[in-house]
């Protein structure tokens, strides 16, 4: 059976030493109820749940999968019990407002809790994760009556939530959705249409499912300006809050997928289902993007969790597997061979994974802290700066973390050799489960276009320049004995500053340029961000003594010498322009003659 030990020491180091969590909590009156001891206790309890409850049903859940029969989805054995335990423990509402039954914990803490569940059972976590996202959208845009009706039961786990956007013909371009919302005299709407790829669209974990559905009224403006958001419960809710009659919202089937097989991905049919408008007509996309942005950071955590899981198992296998001898001489004379951990290429794969894991974890906490500032700070200027940072870095958190994680998981599978390709060791499931993280909630290519387009060109590089200024201010303050990471980070910041200006000028002259450059630009920004995280971790580690902290400095040096140089390659590709990409005719791609 695969192993997993929650990286609690690293999590506590990042929270307490790198981001000074307790000081941050105490400086925000809305977080004064949280201290370091509380945060650490939460992480320790989640580690137990992940290791003892969700990990044991990960492989069996994959093998059994969610099933569909007679219009009803059934989750694999053990999922109902695990979900009840998760809900009873208050985990669904960990970061939710206390007003609605949540615990009011900061995002910089909840990202670490989510990482552990993504590491041990991503299919399981997707069910409550969609509920949390739906709750966030409702809390931001729903009426007081709607909040009182739905939020307490969503956060208690009695009910769950979904996000219904995609249609067979409308994925990234939501402006062309066909789902209709016909007004009724009583203020409700009849929702008619089909949605696809709906995670948790049906299941047996909760007594009701609250679908958040994008639809258009008959007189709606064309395109995305005409999208409205509706609450469409699986079962209608009575005046006293109890579950009533069945609504005309039902799954038509579930998808047969490459991975996350225990997570029900449904085709949802709405046949005149009763719906309730959230906010105002034609303003639904803004509400849905509250949920989407939350999910995008969560997908980054899915990548991190899988990569950590894969790394731990590959490192253990490399330690145990004896094969060949070290090129520098026998290391284990009492054995017939040395462990494969003595080989440089095996170490390269493991160190790449570990470096990216630790930087990803720090980056997730950093973005989480920025989200906390936007939610809890009372300083308007500080909130504005944090909002800019979140806007800029959300696509990086989603795309770069999942891209690096997938590479790490493939490398971990390679460490196992042929054993990585068979079911026994868990690596092939890890690969299959993780692949979707680069695809859903906006493909990584779309995230890259968002970064270079909306978050860079549209604001004339202001968001990026603010971020670079923050990085430079931090790096310039580092002591001389950290010059290796200081200089590397400052050089990376200068390279990103320069290529950003290049992009602004090139995009003004050539409309095709930004699309062709987007993925390489995002990866370059991701590398700068990881260098910034290693600079912050190195500063914290330098102030401490012990092997744990010395290893932090050694890993930072590895990152500088073996991973960060890719930044220059990415920038070279950005500057190559779009002509070599766009010069091929459309016929070229299908004409094999």
Placement of each model-derived feature along the sequence:
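C-terminal amphipathic alpha-helical interaction region
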Residues: 100, 112, 458, 473-593
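A structural-propensity feature for long, helix-poor, extended segments
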Residues: 132-134, 143-146, 150, 443, ...
């Amino acid at each position: 059976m695969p192993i997993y030990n929650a990286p609690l020491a690293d999590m506590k180091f990042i929270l307490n030493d790198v981001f000074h969590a307790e000081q941050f909590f105490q400086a925000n009156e809305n977080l004064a109820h949280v201290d370091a001891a509380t945060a650490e206790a939460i992480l320790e309890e989640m580690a137990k749940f992940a290791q003892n409850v969700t990990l044991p049903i990960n492989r069996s859940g994959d093998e059994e999968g969610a099933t569909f029969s007679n219009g009803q989805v059934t989750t694999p054995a053990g999922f109902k019990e695990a979900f009840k335990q998760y809900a009873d423990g208050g985990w669904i509402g960990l970061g939710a407002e206390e007003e609605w039954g949540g615990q009011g914990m900061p995002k910089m803490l909840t990202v670490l809790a989510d990482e552990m569940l993504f590491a041990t059972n991503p299919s399981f976590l997707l069910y409550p994760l969609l509920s949390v996202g739906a709750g966030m959208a409702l809390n931001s845009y729903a009426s007081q009556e709607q909040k009182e009706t739905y939020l307490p039961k969503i956060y208690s786990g009695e009910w769950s939530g979904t996000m219904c956007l995609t249609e067979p013909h409308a994925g990234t371009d939501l402006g062309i959705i066909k789902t209709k919302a016909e007004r009724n005299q009583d203020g409700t709407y009849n929702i008619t249409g089909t949605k696809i790829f709906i995670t948790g669209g049906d299941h047996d974990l909760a007594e009701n499912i609250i679908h958040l559905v994008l639809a258009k009224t008959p007189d709606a403006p064309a395109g995305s300006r005409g999208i409205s958001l509706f609450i469409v419960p699986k079962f209608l809710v009575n005046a006293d809050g109890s579950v009533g009659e069945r609504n005309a919202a039902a799954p038509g089937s579930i998808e047969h997928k490459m991975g996350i097989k225990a997570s029900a991905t449904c085709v949802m049919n709405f046949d005149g289902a009763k719906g309730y408008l959230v906010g105002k007509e034609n303003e639904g996309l803004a509400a849905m993007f509250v949920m989407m942005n939350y999910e995008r950071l969560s997908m980054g955590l899915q990548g991190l969790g899988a990569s950590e899981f894969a790394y731990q198992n590959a490192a253990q296998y490399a330690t145990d597997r004896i094969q060949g001898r070290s090129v520098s001489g026998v290391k284990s004379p009492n054995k017939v061979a040395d462990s494969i951990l003595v080989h440089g290429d095996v170490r390269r794969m493991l160190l790449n994974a570990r470096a990216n894991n630790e930087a990803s974890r720090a980056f997730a906490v950093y973005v989480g802290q920025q989200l906390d500032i936007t939610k809890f700070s009372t300083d308007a200027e500080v909130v504005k700066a944090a909002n800019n940072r979140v806007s800029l870095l959300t696509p990086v958190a989603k795309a770069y973390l999942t891209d690096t994680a997938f590479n790490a998981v493939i490398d971990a599978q390679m460490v196992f050799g042929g054993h990585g390709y068979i079911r026994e060791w868990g690596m092939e499931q890890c690969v299959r489960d993780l692949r979707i993280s680069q695809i859903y909630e906006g493909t990584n290519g779309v995230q890259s276009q968002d970064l270079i387009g909306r978050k860079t060109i549209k604001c004339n590089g202001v968001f990026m320049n603010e971020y670079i200024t923050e990085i430079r201010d931090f790096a310039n303050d580092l002591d001389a004995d950290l010059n290796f990471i200081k200089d590397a980070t400052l050089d990376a910041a200068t390279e990103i500053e320069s290529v950003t200006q290049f992009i602004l000028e090139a995009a003004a002259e050539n409309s095709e340029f930004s699309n062709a450059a987007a993925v390489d630009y995002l990866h370059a920004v991701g590398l700068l961000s990881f260098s910034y995280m290693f600079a912050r971790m190195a500063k914290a580690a330098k102030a401490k003594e012990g092997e744990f902290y010395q290893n932090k400095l050694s890993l930072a040096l590895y990152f500088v010498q073996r991973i960060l140089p890719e930044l220059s390659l990415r920038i070279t590709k950005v500057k190559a322009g779009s002509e070599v990409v766009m010069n091929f005719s459309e016929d070229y791609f299908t004409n094999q003659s």
